[in-house]
């Protein structure tokens, strides 16, 4: 996926990244279940609470569980067919990223966007030169946004450990929680760093996103893509 050059005109196919966002993938429900079982949040309510902090907490719950699964950054972008006039990008499907526990910037962004759409939090895919990260609305009206550098997900250890119920003793007669380490502080610190880095990149871009002719800076609206049949 990317740009194709026809004569001197670039054909922009970046909107196709939205096709990799799949909120109906069965793995999405499993991720949400693990997040609830881990106890980071009691429920996924989207914007119902009307509190941006509640939205951030829900996104963090997903971050924490993906860290527990061992997802790490992997900069694999090469495609099977390369052409001088086509700039392309390899994108993993959700199940590939989860099975291989690795994701590049695009893989991680579409994975998070898929889960957020499932819980009615509005995501966008943010494109800057040579890179992608995630944006998401903190309110239903889309007046306040946060940005997440998904490649930092491997920077803290919230890995699975032995045992159940958050690494401790399982509750008798109750459902088993996924064995997630109790080092919430390190996990939360990495999430806060990823939010700060996402915001830094948006601030650095300045007005570039407002220039529709600048294809290097785009925010791909997944809902708009869905309405167009993508």
Locate the predicted segments by residue.
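A structural boundary/capping signal
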Residues: 1-230
